[in-house]
Amino acid sequence: RQPKQSRTGYVNSESSRHFFVDDLEHPYNDDVNKFNWIRGYHVGGRSLTWGRHTYRLTDLDFEANLKDGIAIDWPIRYKDISPWYDYVDQFIGVQGRNEGISHFPDRKFLLKPFGLNILENHMRDSFSKNFSDGRILSNARTAHVTEGTKPGLGRVSCQLRNRCMRGCQYGAYFSSNSSTLPVAEATGNMTLMPNSIVHEIIYDEDTKKAKGVRVIDSENNKSYEYFAKVIFLCSSAIASTSILMQSKSNRFPNGLGNDSGELGHNLMDHHFQVGASGRFDGFKNKTTYGRRPAGYYIPRFRNIGGKTNQKDFIRGYGYQGAASRGFMGIANSKEEMVSYGPRLKEIIVQPNEWTAGHGAFGEILPYHDNKMELDYDKKDKWGLPTVTFNATIRENERAMRKDMRQQAAEMLERSGFKDIYDWEDKYVFGNGIHEMGTARMGHDPKTSVLNKFNQVHSVKNVYVTDGACMTSSGCQNPSITYMALTARAANHAVDELNKQNI
């Protein structure tokens, strides 16, 4: 019952399949251009299944649209969000190392890194010797506790089991279930309402404010209304935008806050499934300890100035990868196939050859006609309109993918790898599971949906702080940016409430 959820290969395991929706109950439409909308509707949401990589956007990203003459300018810069990145880092716990690179900025509260293994350190040294464009191999910066503890439900250090997709009973990686929800519950001010399908924001024509939300209980199919002074949408880009689109009134016949006509447009993702892997002869007397849930990261090294600028494409990409020396397993050698008893046991626990591989995440530009719409003729089991997607990558992304593939292989070649295999799968929108941009931030209400504090321009007591708000995508995993923007917006909302402005 998950034909679309299983398209990416990310949702194939018995231990994690329940974290993703039943496609028959939650249909969507991608007949024109295939779109992989991978999601789950449960308490904790994607915080249970995210990849946990946390890389900041910088002014290289925030200024890119303006400099390139693409779409519209971001209404914020790094200095506006940097304190809130710090706030989130300190709260959730992020491990990694500082490198002194402006577009891969140092962070105040990094926990001790998992560490690079001997082959990864060899690759790091090789990069510094063989490339003059500033590229480095660093520790992946991921939201895992590696020392001490963090706020939440008794969070402790990572046990190096690498079973994160099952949900971590130790709370070692950040999830809302292990961290923010317990902290919110402890205040005594949280009421959690699971099985609630929010489908509309209630707009008050007299006060010109939102006054609540309408929801359907997925268990009994009854409708309920809840009221509040401030409403935050943070249910992932597509879901939040869908709620805004369904929130129609005399003032907003085309969806709440959609004066600009941009709601649902400028849909972005990160394109990936491009990379290379290879085999390394050497370090045969070395192996690894435990099962790290994170490997290495190669920050962006294209179009960052000077000789790194490319003539075939703008923006850039980064790589995520790992080197390992797994065990032989069953039937990985001729001797295994003919052995039995003690000899077989001896063989299968011998470490295999060293291998390494990395895949790239690249930026997709904000094209206006990459969009989502609602289809009221095709409804789900709760009578709500389904989402129709129409989005493709263009020439800039195709040129970038060619370079991503070439550089992935070249880095392994210069590091002494053999039997190098480079690949590029056909990209389908949504494969990155980083969809964003459908209710973008901007200076001008005529060209954007949200202002610099993530408020809907024309309904100031509604905030949208998930991927929908993004004005460009960068190439970095975006969740840490959503968290920082959410914390910043929540602080702003408290100030505005105290001033009685909303």
Predicted regions and their residues:
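Short, solvent-exposed loop/turn and secondary-structure capping segments
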Residues: G51-R52, D61, N65, T149-P151, ...
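Conserved redox-cofactor binding core of oxidoreductases
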Residues: Q2-D22, H26-N36, Y41, G51-R56, ...
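A conserved FAD-binding loop/helix module that cradles the flavin
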Residues: S472-A493
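FAD cofactor-binding and catalytic pocket of flavoenzymes
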Residues: V21-R39, V43-R46, W50-G51, R56, ...
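A glycine-rich dinucleotide-binding beta-alpha-beta segment and adjacent secondary-structure elements
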Residues: S6-R7, S16-R17, V21-L24, N33, ...
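A non-catalytic, amphipathic alpha-helix used as a structural packing/dimerization or gating element
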Residues: I76-Y87, E262, D403-Q407, R488
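Alpha-helix N-cap/helix-initiation motif
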Residues: I70, Y173, N221-Y224, K229, ...
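Glycine-rich loop(s) and the adjacent beta-strand/alpha-helix scaffold that form part
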Residues: R1, Y170, T187, S196, ...
